[in-house]
Swiss-Prot record:
<dbReference type="GO" id="GO:0009056">
    <property type="term" value="P:catabolic process"/>
</dbReference>
<dbReference type="GO" id="GO:0008142">
    <property type="term" value="F:oxysterol binding"/>
</dbReference>
<dbReference type="InterPro" id="IPR010497">
    <property type="entry name" value="Epoxide_hydro_N"/>
</dbReference>
<feature type="active site" description="Proton acceptor">
    <location>
        <position position="431"/>
    </location>
</feature>
<dbReference type="GO" id="GO:0019369">
    <property type="term" value="P:arachidonate metabolic process"/>
</dbReference>
<dbReference type="GO" id="GO:0009636">
    <property type="term" value="P:response to toxic substance"/>
</dbReference>
<keyword id="KW-0058">Aromatic hydrocarbons catabolism</keyword>
<keyword id="KW-0443">Lipid metabolism</keyword>
<keyword id="KW-0488">Methylation</keyword>
<feature type="topological domain" description="Cytoplasmic">
    <location>
        <begin position="22"/>
        <end position="455"/>
    </location>
</feature>
<keyword id="KW-1133">Transmembrane helix</keyword>
<keyword id="KW-0378">Hydrolase</keyword>
<dbReference type="InterPro" id="IPR029058">
    <property type="entry name" value="AB_hydrolase_fold"/>
</dbReference>
<dbReference type="GO" id="GO:0004301">
    <property type="term" value="F:epoxide hydrolase activity"/>
</dbReference>
<comment type="similarity">
    <text>Belongs to the peptidase S33 family.</text>
</comment>
<dbReference type="InterPro" id="IPR016292">
    <property type="entry name" value="Epoxide_hydrolase"/>
</dbReference>
<dbReference type="Pfam" id="PF06441">
    <property type="entry name" value="EHN"/>
</dbReference>
Length: 455
């Protein structure tokens, strides 16, 4: 009798798992108000205003004075980047920042694309909107929303934008031409931060959906990595009929019984359908998954619990802010860069570009609000949000970059995104795909869009 009850329970669980998992359920769209105080009476101002990044001599002088008052602790002998950012190499970066980096010139570069702001749910939302310089007769550019993560910004997309808006001039096929919109997540860079608790990725997705409607787009493509991947996923869950296609270079697969099979070992993994490339990227399991996640997720626990405390230090010290952020651009680009004295930073990025991203955080004072995003999204615990339990029912493409913090096999992606139509093993690259390998990412986006358009 007990055996029969046990078997019936297991069978019931299996049926529930598959039935509940396959149900095409979307998130409720709802509404919100995140500005200070109560929502005012009347309609919100929906005007779209031109915006320019600005700076001043006072801002630059203050930065230089703070750098001049540096107080560093010498690194341990032969520690390289295993203890975090190596202060010997940090001295080189600070010297460049203080004496060679030209913030005014970088502001001009930032302003080379059109910037705008508009009020949505009480927040001033910043975005860049880049249209193709020319469109062949009879063609219409495809709207593409691209969403950044942490510790990046809208600046991550500056090198990929011309490949998408003007591909022919950059040696790429012009079969697909895009009109690119890159917003700043509220609390990041030039987008106003929420004044209230609870502003998470779903709230962001809803605001960005309203932004696209305000720009006149009823249907559009979306792309993201890091937090951008979650925001875009939530958009597809909120308004699937408006999302023509979802392209990701990172996936947060939380409800996934397949992950347990990794513990069975490499040979069993092969029998369960993982490819040889999956095996290379996931094994040895302890080093490439367990230890890797332990090494790289410490910051996340602080932010998901008490983000404001460390934020006080980072918002007051440009040196501390730079070390904190640049360390991620080292090991999240390639974990083996821990073994290098300079963290491998200049192998993939220029100091000019890295410091431009730092300056966006520094001049806007947005490091604290950007960290609060972790508490709002992760602070309630595992599987606490409805969107974590829902699948995504829009055409999906995934670019698996080999040096991402953790590899996500195709069969895992498909559990969350059953309409996966494109999965690409990328030849190189890590977490910051658009910043590090813009051409590879652009080509994969175009390949995915081509598949969607031919469906």
């Amino acid at each position: 009798m007990l055996l029969e009850l046990l078997l019936a329970s297991v069978l019931g669980f299996v049926i529930y798992w598959f039935v509940s998992g396959d149900k095409e359920e979307s998130l409720p769209l709802e509404d919100g108000w995140w500005g200070p105080g109560s929502r005012p009476v009347g309609l919100e101002d929906e005007s779209i205003r031109p915006f320019k990044v600005e700076t001043s001599d006072e801002e630059i002088n203050d930065l230089h004075q703070r750098i001049d008052r540096i107080r560093l602790t010498p690194p341990l002998e032969n520690s390289r980047f295993h203890y975090g950012f190596n202060s010997n190499y940090l001295k080189k970066i600070l010297s460049y920042w203080r004496h060679e980096f030209d913030w005014k010139k970088q502001v001009e570069i930032l302003n080379s694309y059109p910037h705008f702001k508009t009020k949505i749910e009480g927040l001033d939302i910043h975005f860049i909107h880049v249209k193709p310089p020319q469109v062949p007769p009879g063609r219409t550019p495809k709207p593409l929303l691209m969403v950044h993560g942490w510790p990046g910004s809208f600046f991550e997309f500056y090198k990929i934008i011309p490949l998408l808006t003007d591909p022919k001039s950059h040696g790429l096929s012009d079969e697909h031409i895009f009109e690119v919109i890159c917003p700043s997540i509220p609390g990041y860079g030039f987008s106003q931060a929420s004044s209230k608790k609870g502003f998470n990725s779903v709230s962001t997705a809803r605001i960005f959906y309203k932004l696209m409607l305000r720009l006149g787009f009823q249907e559009f493509y979306i792309q993201g990595g890091d937090w951008g991947a979650l925001v875009c996923t939530n958009m597809a869950q909120l308004v699937p009929s408006h999302v023509k296609g979802l392209h990701l270079n990172m996936a947060l697969i939380l409800r996934n019984h397949y992950t347990l099979t990794l513990l069975l070992g490499r040979r069993i993994g092969g029998l369960l359908g993982y490819t040889e490339r999956d095996m290379e990227l996931l094994y040895p399991f302890k080093e490439k998954v367990f230890y890797s996640l332990m090494r790289e997720s410490g910051y996340m626990h602080i932010r998901a619990t008490k983000p404001d405390t460390v934020g006080c230090a980072l918002n007051d010290s440009p040196v501390g802010l730079a070390a904190y952020i640049l360390e991620k651009f080292s090991t999240w680009t390639n974990s083996e860069f821990r073994d290098l004295e300079d963290g491998g930073l200049e192998r993939k990025f220029s100091l000019q570009d890295l410091l431009t991203n730092i300056m966006i955080y520094w001049t806007t004072g947005s490091i604290v609000s950007s960290q609060r995003y972790y508490k709002e999204n992760l602070g309630q615990g595992f599987m606490a949000h409805k969107h974590e339990r829902l699948k995504v029912h829009v055409p999906t493409g995934f670019a698996a970059f080999p040096c991402e913090i953790m590899h996500v096999p195709e069969k895992w992606v498909r559990t969350k995104y059953p309409q996966l139509i494109s999965y690409s093993y990328m030849p190189r690259g890590g977490h910051f795909a658009a910043f590090e390998e813009p051409e590879l990412l652009a080509r994969d986006i175009c390949k995915f869009v081509g598949l969607v358009e031919r469906q």
